[in-house]
Amino acid sequence: MKLALDGMGGDNAPKSVIEGALLALEQIPNLEIQLYGQQEKLEPFLKQHDRLTIVPCEEVVEGTDDPARAVRRKKDSSMARMMDAVDEGRADACLSAGNTGALMAGGLFKVGRIEGIARPALATTLPTLDGKGFLMLDLGANADARPEHLVPYAIMGDIYAKKVGGLQKPRIGLLNIGTEDKKGNELTKATFDLLKEANLNFIGNVEARDLLEGVADVVVTDGFTGNMVLKSIEGTAGALFSMLKEAFMSSTKTKISAVLMKNNLRDLKHKMDYTEYGGAGLFGLQAPVIKAHGSSNAKAIFSAIRQANTMVEHTVISTITETVRHIEID
């Protein structure tokens, strides 16, 4: 698999990006990486590797840049050149921890949509208490959505869960304010009816409070709601660990308890660690475009690269393309 990697994207770039790339090259035998970035900033962290190629770029898409303008004007940026490589067939997938809006805009302009997918969705695997995780989409690619957008999200999620997660009949849930069939607003009510008729293992409405308990394998929602849920989970997990740390450090007795519970706490942290789950995929494009977390460390970059490699090896995109070609949504 040939991966185009943005070496300049993210809070910890290029150090963590390069470290994650080298780790991936060690563990994924068929992987070849094209690293795009400003050579003078990449070189201090580079190690020679026969499957790592440096592609010098003069510009960088900053987090503060206007997404559409950055893609159009910064043509020699690491992010733009990375997506050009996919568009021109020189890479099978691309990955960046940089500006999310610019990556989505570039994905649409350069990589292109799959025919039949009106609006791509941002999807990622989120943690569950049993450690298996669940796929959720859309996480913010489109703040507004219609029922005919959400049904393809469910189809793409179903294919991903089967191909990558190895599930035979993924449970598809529609995020709602209640589990009853007629709950929700016009969007969820209409989407519910369409999903009920689709050739999917649709289990009905699911509530946000049940997500981390693994109520569904794939959860579908609009981008506005999905983004709020994602950030609520991230914020709650961070606050919870801070409170636990404060509680365990409050006295000698609690410090001893913390030592005794060390393995249990490590397991809990492992389950809730976003670096284990890879990045967010922009589903609905003609090639895998992966967005790693902006604060990704080397481990998170490695996980995102592994995710891209798995998507290519399991032909996720071609399966989505073939499936939606034969589906009509009224």
From Swiss-Prot:
It holds the Pfam family FA_synthesis. One of its GO terms (molecular function) is phosphate:acyl-[acyl carrier protein] acyltransferase activity. It comes from the Bacteria. InterPro entries: FA_synthesis, Phospholipid_synth_PlsX-like. GO terms for biological process: fatty acid biosynthetic process; phospholipid biosynthetic process. It is found in: Cytoplasm. It is an enzyme of class 2 (transferase). The keyword Ribonucleoprotein does not apply. Its EC number is 2.3.1.274. Keywords: Cytoplasm, Lipid biosynthesis, Lipid metabolism, Phospholipid biosynthesis, Phospholipid metabolism, Transferase. Belongs to the PlsX family. Homodimer. Probably interacts with PlsY. This is Phosphate acyltransferase. The gene is plsX.
